[in-house]
Design a protein with these regions (language model features):
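Small beta-barrel nucleic-acid-binding modules, primarily SNase/OB-fold domains
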Residues: 2-10, 17-139
């Protein structure tokens, strides 16, 4: 019985690592400072970066907020010029939001983009509903 339990736990732990592993993607289109589009197998998806909020640059009700365009341009330049663009789902969050956007951590050439945006003043930490895997890196 113990051997079966150990085998089951080993398989479970290995499989969860594959589910939430980083996935290399292709940049498609800029939207704003915390949202952009990617291609995966020739299908386009909208990305919403977890745990941060940038000033709005295209919001229909809020309009353009202070530093919204700068945050959007900074993010766009980072993802558009990335040699390697990767996303990673968080095991403590849904994969999509109510708008159908993928909720992910974003890595540009191995660097956590959310951390970069916060450190450079383009984003603030926000929308922390769970204990996310990279939250401590943002502080």
């Amino acid at each position: 019985m113990i051997k079966k339990t150990i085998l089951f736990l080993s398989i479970f732990l290995i499989s969860t690592n594959f589910v939430y592993a980083k996935e290399t993607v292709t940049f498609s289109e800029c939207v704003d400072g915390d949202t952009f589009k990617i291609l995966v197998d020739n299908k386009e998806y909208s990305i919403r970066m977890l745990a941060i909020d940038t000033p709005e640059s295209v919001h229909p009700q809020k309009g353009v907020e202070y530093y919204g365009k700068e945050a959007s341009e900074y993010t766009c330049n980072k993802v558009k010029n990335a040699t390697k663009l990767e996303i990673e789902y968080d095991p403590n969050e849904d994969k999509t939001d109510k708008y159908g956007r993928l909720l992910v951590w974003v890595f540009v050439d191995g660097e956590l983009l959310q951390k970069n945006l916060v450190a450079n003043g383009y984003a603030k930490i926000g929308y922390l509903y769970e204990d996310y895997i990279y939250t401590s890196e943002l502080e």
